[in-house]
């Protein structure tokens, strides 16, 4: 089972914590993580892009000139796609881009992302993370005392409101509750800063 250092809020190492091998110790599957991120980004798409066809563009009801006898090319509407101010041929229409990967694939992707953080030594586990009141300054001090990167994902077990409010205004820092942890954020942020309680919650769900 992988072991990582356990820190307190002052940045002092207070011991070690054993992580569940089936969640934090598997060989990361790059292809599955790619598929999951692709699904996440597709599901975020609004799908509202829309262009007008020749039938929907205003005007163009009258035939510009008669069919024969002018020497010009035959044309039925001044709003055909070839003309200026014409409609769009095969343009985007509103659609739903969302889809869902199988449950086992989603779980494997999450375990792979968590394991990659452990392998790359980009996980910092805190004994606890609590504030009496929301103060950005206190969160900044805590982050400065810990070995974290410029972009840090702060994960707590149940989304402590004081922690969320203290962290959400810091550039490059994203607070998250354990139930909302996802592959895209794990890969997008340099360091995973997670509480011991959140680790237990994740292991409870994915082990």
From Swiss-Prot:
Subunit-structure text: Part of the 50S ribosomal subunit.
Molecular function GO labels: rRNA binding; structural constituent of ribosome
Function: One of the primary rRNA binding proteins, this protein initially binds near the 5'-end of the 23S rRNA. It is important during the early stages of 50S assembly. It makes multiple contacts with different domains of the 23S rRNA in the assembled 50S subunit and ribosome.
Pfam family, one: Ribosomal_L4
PANTHER family to which the protein is assigned, alphabetical: 50S RIBOSOMAL PROTEIN L4, LARGE RIBOSOMAL SUBUNIT PROTEIN UL4M
Annotated family: Belongs to the universal ribosomal protein uL4 family.
Superkingdom as given in the UniProt entry: Bacteria
UniProt organism field: Syntrophomonas wolfei subsp. wolfei (strain DSM 2245B / Goettingen)
Disulfide bond sites: none
Record's protein name: Large ribosomal subunit protein uL4
Sorted UniProt keywords: Ribonucleoprotein, Ribosomal protein, RNA-binding, rRNA-binding
Biased composition, class Basic residues, residue ranges: 60-71
HAMAP family in alphabetical order: Ribosomal_uL4_B
One CC-aspect GO term: ribonucleoprotein complex
Gene Ontology biological process terms in this record: translation
Region spans: Disordered: 47-78
């Amino acid at each position: 089972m992988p072991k990582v250092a356990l820190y307190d809020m002052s940045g002092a190492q207070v011991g070690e914590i054993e992580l569940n091998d089936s969640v934090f110790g598997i060989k990361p599957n790059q292809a599955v993580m790619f598929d999951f991120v692709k699904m996440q980004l597709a599901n975020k798409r609004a799908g509202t892009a829309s262009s007008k066809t020749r039938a929907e563009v205003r005007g163009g009801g009258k035939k510009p000139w008669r069919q024969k006898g002018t020497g010009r090319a035959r044309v039925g509407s001044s709003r055909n796609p070839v003309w200026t101010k014409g409609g769009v041929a095969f343009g985007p229409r509103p659609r739903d881009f969302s889809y869902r990967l199988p449950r086992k694939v989603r779980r494997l992707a999450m375990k792979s992302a968590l394991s990659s953080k452990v392998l790359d030594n980009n996980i910092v586990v805190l004994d606890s993370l609590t504030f009496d009141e929301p103060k950005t300054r206190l969160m900044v001090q805590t982050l400065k005392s810990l070995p974290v990167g410029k972009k840090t994902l702060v994960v707590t077990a149940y989304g402590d409101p004081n922690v969320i409010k203290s962290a959400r205004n810091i550039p490059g820092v994203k607070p998250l509750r354990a139930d909302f942890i996802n592959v895209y954020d794990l890969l997008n942020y340099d360091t995973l800063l997670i509480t011991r309680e959140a680790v237990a919650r994740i292991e409870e769900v994915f082990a």
